[in-house]
Amino acid sequence: MQVLVDADACPAVIKDMLFRAARRAEICVTLVANQFLRTPPSPFIKAVQVPAGFDVADARIVELAEPGDLVITADIPLAAAVLDKGAHALDPRGNWFSRENIEERLSTRAMMDQLRSAGIDTGGPAPFSARDGKTFASQLDRFLARHAPR
């Protein structure tokens, strides 16, 4: 089991939590981004830099994902793709993507894209909060308690 991170838009506080979890649980955490990422020295943490381009990092994450892995992403289509491969998907706010909710999330995303294309201001997500970080930490700990190798 490994943790793959869609790192381009992942909040720094979440990356720090993942770095601590990697060392504590001795699991591989791989950050994938189209820019250079500084990571702490650890045999459990690595960064993969991909070329710039639309969805290049997402494609690499899908390629690397295996059944049982955990993918951290806010990207709904990426979450759908890794769920199809049997991986788990968690967003940086601690919300799970699942077979039960992914179609609705994709539909909502498509509708919001259509509204934006029509010139309607749909706003954006709320700023990342301390509560979001706590929710993420709780969900990550629960997942690792069930799935990390012992």
Swiss-Prot record:
It comes from the Bacteria. NCBIfam families: PRK00124.1 (NF001095). Belongs to the UPF0178 family. This is UPF0178 protein Bcen2424_1660. It comes from Burkholderia cenocepacia (strain HI2424).
